[in-house]
């Protein structure tokens, strides 16, 4: 019998227990077949890293929403996607892969650091339409239910229309509703400064925290993801796996 519901693989970088991933499952569980494979603990900032030198563990967890199967993985978000496709979904390819909902902004250059985006990029490289959802609200207990309508609209659009090959979506919600609507926009040119907090332990050795402040390098631009979320819009940034600078290539001589 043909499967009537779309199959969606869900992962994140905040861990299988995170509020954001549970909220996403609640949004989708009534009309999608879902599988959750997510890190056993927070893996923020792991981007597209995978475990090349250590073995991985999978552990079955309590179901979400009564019948949504949940597994935790000892590795990175990308490991979760790779293992899920190989161990659980070899006979039925997902219609969609989703990373999120992330607790924190993944616009601008955060796109490159984000494990949530790592999920979407890995899905994209596996030729599966993929989306990353993030909220600019960093509170791990934040009420994310206001994101429901926006998430469902994007998911349904991608399931119906698909995405270009090697393109995934980076979707960022403002910290607080109401949301003014959607903006298709480009990635903001930004950077991190003052990133290292150097401290001295009471036992005498030095140690360091990676902290930092985000700097918008084009604050006047109005076509960027940062502008959109700062002005109450849901930012949708199509992200290509191919990062070649074709303009530079046109003029290359050596």
List the model feature ranges, each with a label.
Residues 10-17, 110-111:
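Short, glycine-rich nucleotide/cofactor-binding loops
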Residues 2-4, 8, 19-87:
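A cross-family phosphate/adenosyl-ligand binding-site feature
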Residues 7, 95-96:
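Structural motif
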Residues 144-254:
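Electrostatically charged, flexible surface regions
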Residues 119-123:
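Hydrophobic/aromatic ligand-binding patch that stacks against planar heteroaromatic rings
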Residues 105-114:
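Glycine/threonine-rich flexible loop motifs
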Residues 124-146:
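Glycine-rich phosphate/pyrophosphate-binding loops
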Residues 88-94:
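Glycine-rich phosphate-binding loop signature in dinucleotide/nucleotide-binding domains
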């Amino acid at each position: 019998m043909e499967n009537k519901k779309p199959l969606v693989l869900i992962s994140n970088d905040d861990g299988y227990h995170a509020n954001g991933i549970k909220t996403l499952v609640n949004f989708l569980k009534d009309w999608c077949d879902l599988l959750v494979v997510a890190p056993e603990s927070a893996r923020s900032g792991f981007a597209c890293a995978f475990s090349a030198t250590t073995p991985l563990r999978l552990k079955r967890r309590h179901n979400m929403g009564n019948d949504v199967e949940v597994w935790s993985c000892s590795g990175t978000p990308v490991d979760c996607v790779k293992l899920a496709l190989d161990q659980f979904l070899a006979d039925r390819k997902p219609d969609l892969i989703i990373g999120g909902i992330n607790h924190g902004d993944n616009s601008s250059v955060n796109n490159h650091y984000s494990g949530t985006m790592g999920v979407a990029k890995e899905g994209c490289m596996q030729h599966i339409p993929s989306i990353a959802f993030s909220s600019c609200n960093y509170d791990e207990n934040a009420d994310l239910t206001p994101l429901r309508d926006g998430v469902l609209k994007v998911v349904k659009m991608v399931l119906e229309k698909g995405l270009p090959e090697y393109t995934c979506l980076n979707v960022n919600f403002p910290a607080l509703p109401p949301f003014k609507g959607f903006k298709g926009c480009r990635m903001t040119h930004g950077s991190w400064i003052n990133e290292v907090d150097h401290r001295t332990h009471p036992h005498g050795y030095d140690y360091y925290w990676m902290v930092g402040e985000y700097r918008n390098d084009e604050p006047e631009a109005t076509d960027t993801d940062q502008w959109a979320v700062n002005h109450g819009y849901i930012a949708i940034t199509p992200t290509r796996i191919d990062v070649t600078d074709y303009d530079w290539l046109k003029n290359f001589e050596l």
